[in-house]
């Protein structure tokens, strides 16, 4: 661990520059460009002197109207969820076919492997090793009817077709261009975008651009055994390194008379990550209920040491000398802390659930005939038939939305929203120039419980609901 701490010591000035807030004009320019590229011209990001940046409406929104669809900067599907759902590793859209989705799930279930879809994963989580919103996701069933292995294999391999699945077409899976067996895609464009943005450094395949595939494998195993948020932090670092290399190459191509300092190129490459509010992970993570307050110091040191071990493995795997400041523990801790404070659950509804609901809505005679074929599969899946894709992601614009216990907007996936983008919908009419707010917590909780939860985010809520509740105590 010494080398990680030495990086913090030797690159203290560079680390401080990376973690320094962007000047307001640069921040405004960045978000203006982002809003233009997202084509969401009904909003703007503005800095408020008292609460920092926020999202404001520059046009009126009606109740249930779409405010924003925000693309992911970095996101992951939870490791445990990969046995339940085969999705594109870049946009998180379901891929393959209804038959393949059902076949994979039953195959892993027959092996005794199931996803542990726990959104509140901790450093002690045991996640499945895998090779190859407000919406409610399906739970797990302790018992199920096992189908013959040959039937399951036929489903997975496309040798068996179920009735009416043509109504639910899915993109064919494309393998990772680097040759790993972990990443699959819905299209060539998603495969290329993921490769260029981060996966080329994080791929474990033969064409990986990492400097040690063995160390990368150890890093991934450590993350899967402890907390898969490390995989997301690795994506942020790989994203910045690759962006730095691209900016440097473009600068060389321009044959500029004056060489651009490496630090300014690194700061520019880091900019998309720099805009998120940050605190060190071990400082901002909520104290678990089963940890005695007297043990808080030891708990937070344990979290810090866990991050240090993870970073050491990542550094061996993808280290870049020109971007060495990125491999400081201070940077790593702040990246993960940014996710802790800003991330939104990544949820994509399963087309398998839609398929069985479609069967259930068929006319009685046709339904009875169809269910003679489909019912054994539904029974074998149990409650897990409706499992959705679950993960976590950082969304640049959504992360700027401030909290209110009486919010005027919410994250909500509509029927047509079939990928990992964040979808923000108006809960009521929103006036022009009004701030767009969402709730970070369950706003129906009692006042003191709300304030305790929000303290983990580093603020005390003073929305109209909290002011009213506090006056009655």
UniProtKB/Swiss-Prot annotation:
Q: Which UniProt keywords apply?
A: Chromatin regulator, Metal-binding, Methyltransferase, Nucleus, S-adenosyl-L-methionine, Transferase, Zinc, Zinc-finger
The positions annotated for binding Zn(2+) are 176, 180, 199, 203
What is the enzyme's class at the highest EC level? transferase
Asked if Zinc-finger is a keyword of the record, the answer is yes
* Annotated ranges, domain SET: 33-441
- Catalysis: reaction(s): L-lysyl-[histone] + S-adenosyl-L-methionine = N(6)-methyl-L-lysyl-[histone] + S-adenosyl-L-homocysteine + H(+)
Per the record, GO CC terms? nucleus
Role summary: Histone methyltransferase that methylates 'Lys-36' (H3K36me) of histone H3 to produce H3K36me3. Promotes early stages of cellular dedifferentiation through H3K36me3-dependent, and to a lesser degree H3K4me3-dependent, activation of Lateral organ Boundaries-Domain (LBD) (e.g. LBD16 and LBD29) genes. Positive regulator of root organogenesis including lateral root formation as well as adventitious root formation from wounded leaf tissues. Recruited by JMJ30/ARF (e.g.
The name of this protein is Histone-lysine N-methyltransferase ATXR2
What organism is recorded for this protein? Arabidopsis thaliana (Mouse-ear cress)
């Amino acid at each position: 661990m010494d080398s990680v701490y030495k990086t913090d010591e030797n690159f203290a000035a560079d680390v401080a520059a990376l973690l320094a807030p962007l000047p307001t004009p640069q921040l405004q320019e960045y978000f203006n460009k982002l809003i233009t590229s997202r084509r969401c011209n009904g909003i703007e990001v503005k800095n408020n002197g008292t609460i920092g940046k926020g999202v404001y409406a520059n046009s009126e929104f009606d109740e249930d109207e779409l405010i924003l669809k925000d693309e992911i900067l970095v996101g992951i599907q939870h490791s445990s969820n990969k046995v339940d759902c085969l999705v594109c590793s870049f946009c998180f859209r379901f891929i393959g076919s209804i038959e393949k989705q059902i076949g994979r799930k039953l195959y892993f279930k027959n092996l005794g492997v199931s996803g542990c879809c726990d959104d509140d994963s901790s450093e002690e989580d045991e996640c499945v090793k895998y090779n190859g919103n407000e919406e409610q996701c399906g739970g797990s069933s302790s018992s199920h009817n096992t189908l013959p292995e040959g039937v399951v294999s036929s489903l997975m391999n496309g040798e068996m077709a179920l009735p009416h699945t043509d109504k639910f077409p899915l993109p064919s899976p494309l393998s990772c261009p680097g040759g790993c067996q972990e990443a699959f895609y819905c299209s060539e464009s998603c495969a290329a975008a993921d490769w260029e943005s981060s996966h080329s450094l994080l791929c474990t395949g033969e064409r990986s651009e990492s400097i040690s595939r063995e160390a990368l494998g150890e890093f991934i195993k450590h993350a899967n055994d402890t907390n898969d948020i490390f995989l997301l932090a690795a994506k942020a670092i790989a994203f910045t390194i690759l962006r730095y290399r691209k900016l440097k190459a473009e600068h060389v191509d321009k044959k500029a008379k004056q060489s651009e300092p490496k630090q300014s190129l690194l700061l520019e490459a880091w900019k998309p990550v720099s805009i998120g509010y940050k605190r060190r992970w071990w400082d901002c993570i909520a104290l678990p209920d089963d940890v005695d307050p007297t043990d808080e110091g030891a708990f937070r040191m344990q979290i810090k040491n866990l991050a240090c071990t993870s970073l050491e493995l990542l550094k061996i795997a993808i280290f870049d000398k020109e971007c060495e400041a990125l491999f400081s523990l201070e940077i790593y801790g702040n990246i993960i802390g940014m996710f802790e404070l800003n991330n939104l659950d990544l949820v994509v509804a399963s087309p398998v659930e839609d398929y069985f609901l479609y069967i259930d809505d068929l006319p009685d005679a046709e339904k009875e005939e169809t269910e003679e074929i489909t019912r054994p599969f539904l029974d074998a899946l149990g409650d897990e038939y409706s499992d959705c894709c679950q993960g976590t992601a950082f969304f640049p614009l959504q992360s700027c939305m401030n909290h209110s216990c009486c919010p005027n907007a919410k994250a909500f996936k509509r029927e047509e929203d079939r990928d990992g983008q964040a979808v923000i919908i108006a809960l009521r009419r929103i006036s022009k120039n009004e701030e767009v707010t969402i709730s970070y917590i369950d706003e129906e909780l009692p006042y003191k419980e709300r304030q305790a939860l929000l303290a983990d985010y580093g603020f005390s809520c003073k929305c109209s609901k909290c002011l009213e509740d506090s006056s009655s105590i």
